[in-house]
A protein has these predicted regions:
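Loop/turn elements at helix/coil->beta-strand transitions in domains of secreted/extracellular proteins
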Residues: 1-3, 32-38, 90-96, 128-134, ...
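Conserved SGNH/GDSL esterase-like catalytic core that processes O-acyl groups on lipids
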Residues: 4-5, 11-115
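Histidine-centered active-site loop/cap adjacent to the catalytic His
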Residues: 7, 189-227
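Solvent-exposed loop/turn segments at secondary-structure junctions
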Residues: 10-14, 43-49, 100-106, 138-144, ...
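Sec-exported extracytoplasmic/periplasmic mature domains
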Residues: 12, 26, 30-34, 88-91, ...
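Stable alpha-helical elements in mature extracytoplasmic
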Residues: 17, 21, 79, 83, ...
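N-terminal hydrophobic signal/anchor transmembrane helix of membrane proteins
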Residues: 35, 80-89, 167-196
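Substrate-gating cap/lid alpha-helix
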Residues: 121, 140-179, 198-202
Length: 227
């Protein structure tokens, strides 16, 4: 059985009332993947904006495997200390990783963030030397429109992430740099300039799904009808 673990920040955990891209990808794989699979991880909750806590289960559709390793305001530096134990406990075959925006926005520059990504990869491999990882480039948020230095850091980190994936890729533990979400527009695909609305959820799920299909023949391409 194929086990997938979503790892991410606020764009991955989602907040109360949302479906999340995790749900959209699960729906897609349920229809297109030919074998059994599970979504795994140590957490299940959404973020509750009313209480500023990650303890809500008010999904728009709660009837799906909600497991993940994601957190509101958490980035590479927060997930790196957790990933070895999470991989050991939940035994994912594939990590679906969307991290970096919060790091670049508040904690570390592009070079430091890329170093965290390298450490994260090493830690995951300590628990499973054959783990595969699909890495989503950072999607610039609305801040990039008015803060050129921040936009430059995002672009530089994405270049470093691509180099990291190429440098550390191994046949037994492949690293996949996914495509960027198709035609993603923060003015139309988010509800606040950062966090995905329904169309943004579909586009992030599509970026993972298309890359998993093209690189590893998992499932099928994300259909236009799913948007």
């Amino acid at each position: 059985m194929l086990r997938l673990m979503p790892v991410g920040d606020s764009m991955t955990i989602g907040s109360a009332g949302e479906h999340t891209w995790r749900y959209r990808l699960w729906q897609h794989l349920r229809e297109t993947y030919g074998g059994p699979f599970r979504i795994v991880g140590p957490r299940e909750a959404l973020y509750d904006k009313a209480t500023n806590t990650s303890d809500s289960y008010e999904y728009a559709d709660p009837d799906f495997p909600r497991a993940h390793l994601a957190g509101w305001g958490e980035g590479w530096q927060h997930m790196t200390p957790l990933i070895a134990d999470a991989v050991r406990a939940h035994k994912p075959d594939v990590l679906l990783v969307s991290l970096g925006l919060i790091d670049l926005g508040f904690y570390t520059d592009a070079e430091q963030t890329a170093e965290q990504a390298r450490t994260f990869i090493a830690e995951a491999r300590l628990s499973n030397p054959r783990i595969a990882m699909a890495l989503l480039p950072v999607i610039p948020n609305v801040r990039a429109d008015t803060d050129p230095p921040f936009a430059a850091q995002v672009a530089h980190f994405n270049e470093l992430l691509a180099k990291t994936a190429a440098d550390l890729d191994e046949p037994r533990s492949p690293l996949l740099l996914t495509s960027t979400p198709s035609a993603y527009d923060v003015n139309h695909d988010t509800y606040d300039g950062t966090h995905p609305n329904a169309s943004g959820e579909h586009k992030i799920a599509g970026a993972f799904a298309d890359s998993l299909y093209e690189a590893w023949d998992l499932g099928e391409r994300y259909g236009a009808g799913e948007y």
